[in-house]
Curated annotation (Swiss-Prot):
It is a multi-pass membrane protein. Pore-forming subunit of a potassium efflux system that confers protection against electrophiles. Catalyzes K(+)/H(+) antiport. This is Glutathione-regulated potassium-efflux system protein KefB. It comes from Escherichia coli O127:H6 (strain E2348/69 / EPEC). GO terms for molecular function: glutathione-regulated potassium exporter activity. The chain crosses the membrane at residues 4-24, 29-49, 55-75, 87-107, 115-135, 152-172, 177-197, 207-227, 230-250, 268-288, 291-311, 324-344, 356-376. GO terms for cellular component: plasma membrane.
Amino acid sequence: MEGSDFLLAGVLFLFAAVAAVPLASRLGIGAVLGYLLAGIAIGPWGLGFISDVDEILHFSELGVVFLMFIIGLELNPSKLWQLRRSIFGVGAAQVLLSAALLAGLLMLTHFSWQAAVVGGIGLAMSSTAMALQLMREKGMNRSESGQLGFSVLLFQDLAVIPALALVPLLAGSADEHFDWMKIGMKVLAFVGMLIGGRYLLRPVFRFIAASGVREVFTAATLLLVLGSALFMDALGLSMALGTFIAGVLLAESEYRHELETAIDPFKGLLLGLFFISVGMSLNLGVLYTHLLWVVISVVVLVAVKIFVLYLLARLYGVRSSERMQFAGVLSQGGEFAFVLFSSASSQRLFQGDQMALLLVTVTLSMMTTPLLMKLVDKWLSRQFNGPEEEDEKPWVNDDKPQVIVVGFGRFGQVIGRLLMANKMRITVLERDISAVNLMRKYGYKVYYGDATQVDLLRSAGAEAAESIVITCNEPEDTMKLVEICQQHFPHLHILARARGRVEAHELLQAGVTQFSRETFSSALELGRKTLVTLGMHPHQAQRAQLHFRRLDMRMLRELIPMHTDTVQISRAREARRELEEIFQREMQQERRQLDGWDEFE
């Protein structure tokens, strides 16, 4: 691809993402499906703006690579050891059972047994990028089904190595393609990467961090991710697996959070590029020619994988309410199928249109997953948002709620407990199904689902409630919910959680004045206690705390129209001087000994 063509392709990708994703989100079909539809639109079978799909698809795998690096950072070797049974138990069983069933079905459709084995293995894999993205959107990351889903995906990445090695054996060209000396060298190189990463990465990053130049740290992070990906690719292994290992090796380092911050912007853009590329690869010509075959293939593929995954989840002891989430989120074909089928095609294992039909099936199965997860959400909503069962009568009054609490993590739980202790009627909205199960056992009136859906808010009693408390983890969800409440339920008093000053500014701009910055009050209280330990009188420390809170809120309001860092820094310095002057004036006015305050808790 020429330089100008590459730049044009980049502009087209950005335009497609900017145009399609907000529209898809507004239609309620999710960002992933929006990316896929955008890819179809600009690809060779749509408007035809881009024709070199294979090269872009290979480049776009970097999105998966960055995602796996961040996932590795969130784990550590001890956590992986705890997951060993689910990885090598459920993960292995899923691949083997799905591959066997799908291979048998392919043989019934006139695939040779060798092609059927390769096809079954490729179709048994799921899309790491799509599954992890949907698990995050659905709040599954911390749940039992989310942990099990991650274990299955990790085993699938590990299975890439033997699957690729199996292709030339099935093609009957093992002697021609297998050089056992080269394989031994690759194994040694892989072991060398593990040992070198274990003992060299932290000293190297310590040296780079000592320079104090943030750009160099970001460059070093990119070098690590791309370098480990290329190294694994040169060995014929999964690039995503290489960066995952690099992330795990750094998971316990002091640079973990800085690494996540440096990588996150690249991960999001490249993941979007990956989904657009998958959409571009959809061969609409094959779809038109073999429409019935493709539709049946997609339905059978998704049904077989759901059956296997649901069965394994049940055997593993996953709660019944989480099994469908687990099965649905992994029901699609995966990006690894493109690699495996290309390798098999080069070995002439497939005949005629077999490879094209398989690739179309995989691509369309990816497009079914966001829609399938919406159906699962609706099913769970009907199951958990209907009338309580007789054996699960909560002590919460069944009257219309006074307060709706959105999100019931650690922040929301404190609020909910305080309200219930004062006999307030509350309803909780939560999208983590495992949390819903737990809260119902403790007697909370809780609805499952996405609180940004107007129908869910209405069924939860938003039209009769007096207030809504928003404690979402994601600032984007908070702002979207604020907009919905202001539009559809203007009578509600909106109270919200702000992660920091940026979110506080956004809430103020949206007209929300009742909010709490999650670390501000606790930090201010600890600061007051510090003043007391340094000799300040408890009453004076309390006054200082109140003055600081008042001044900080005033400064927060004044900074709303000021968007540049320079202006904000200048105003912050001015506010600090103003705070010091206030304290000095108070000290001059209070010349008396404050004996009434000996201790303040």
